[in-house]
Amino acid sequence: DVYKRQDAYIASTEKNLDINICPYIEANPETEFIIFFPPYSILFWNDVIMENHLDATIEEYRYIAERLNAYANVKVYFFPDQEEIISDLNNYADYSHYHPKFNRYMTECFANGECLVKKEGEEGLGAGKTIDEYLAHMREIAENFDYEELLLRRG
């Protein structure tokens, strides 16, 4: 199954970035772009696990972060591993649309550097973590979360 492959999403993601995002970044070098991965609910990650797409999804996140962080005028932020947000289904209208109050939290992070994905060579400097650190934490959450208990509570 193609979706079980670690690189299953890379070609389509690369094409999407090449067409829809990177040209605008490159055409506007004086503009700072803030790109963020949103905090999809744990139900999104349940689907990823059930469909055996975890490796491909993790690699897609890694590819996007590394590709965009290569630009001097881009800052990338990572919110998917905010367990206290993503594990509370009351924070969501559905599995990807979170409560508007989290927009304020994210903009505060943009200002203070929390949840920043560090660029290559910035390890150990200031706020934020490397994409590998964020993804390792996200993998840990996705693989170890008690989905059955959550779904029983919601039932």
Regions found by a protein language model. Name each.
Residues 9-23:
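A Trp-anchored, charged/polar loop motif used as the substrate-binding/catalytic surface
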Residues 6-11, 50-52, 92-93:
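Second-shell loop/turn segments in exported
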Residues 91-141:
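Histidine-centered active-site loop/cap adjacent to the catalytic His
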Residues 25-51, 78-82:
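Active-site segments of SGNH/GDSL-like serine hydrolases
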Residues 44-77:
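Substrate-gating cap/lid alpha-helix
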Residues 72-88:
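Acidic carboxylate-rich catalytic motifs and surrounding loops in phosphoryl-/glycosyl-chemistry enzymes
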Residues 16-20, 59, 63, 101-106:
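Extracytoplasmic/secreted proteins, especially bacterial periplasmic and envelope-associated proteins
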Residues 2-3:
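Short, small-residue-biased leader/transition segments that mark boundaries at the very start
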